[in-house]
Amino acid sequence: MTDEEFEPPAAGGAPGVPDVAAERPTAARRVVALLEVLLCSDYPTQAALGTTFAAFGYRPYSATGQLRVGFVVALSLADTALLIGLMLCFLYAHGERARDVFLGRRRVAPEASLGIPLIVVALAIGIAILATVQRYAPSLHTVEHNPLQDLIRTPRNAWLFALVVVVAGGLREELQRAFLLRRFEWLGGASFGLVVVSLAFGAGHLLQGVDAAIATGTLGAFWGLVYLRRRSVVAPVVSHSGFNLLQIVQFLVVGK
């Protein structure tokens, strides 16, 4: 990868489109940005959908205490649709174009090609962190059995979960990360936002263990950095999706 390939685009939006993030934010705009960050943090939307599902008698666990794959798929895809809809509404309300925020001035095909080797980089980061934790801080391995592994024990469930990790993982989370980083440009800067968003991303994976949360938080920072340098979500989406799919393949092959 050359330095030229990874050079960030020039500041400013597309011709004729106001560069909202570059404007000096007013106090009111900061308050609005904070509200949008909270609403698009994933916690409110998932809580609302989970409550709605429960009201209709559709609960996450079966009578035997196992996590329902149907619930996870339905919640993840519904949350993806709701969250993307919210972000598009907020962008429209501020006169921002989704293409400018999510794709920038980069062409899609070259960005997708860049994302492929970044899958390997993401794998290296994940392996290095987990190996370091296992060597120097084994107490952080707080979950012996990842509960999500039970969702992919059959070919049908594996395919369903693959859909989830691509659509709700790779696509939704990278669009969400880009939107939140954009809003943090009004709330202390993108670098500050990268730290906050990465910590929140890691915290969302505590169900899988503290070590997994550290690894995923670091990976979130990596993908966020790629977005900030490229101003396009395409490479992070490809890298994130590929990383998730390889994790499924790993479990199917070696069983852990």
Per-region residue spans from a language model:
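N-terminal, membrane-interfacial amphipathic/helix-forming hydrophobic leader that caps
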Residues: M1-F102, A109-P110, R135-Y136, I248-K256
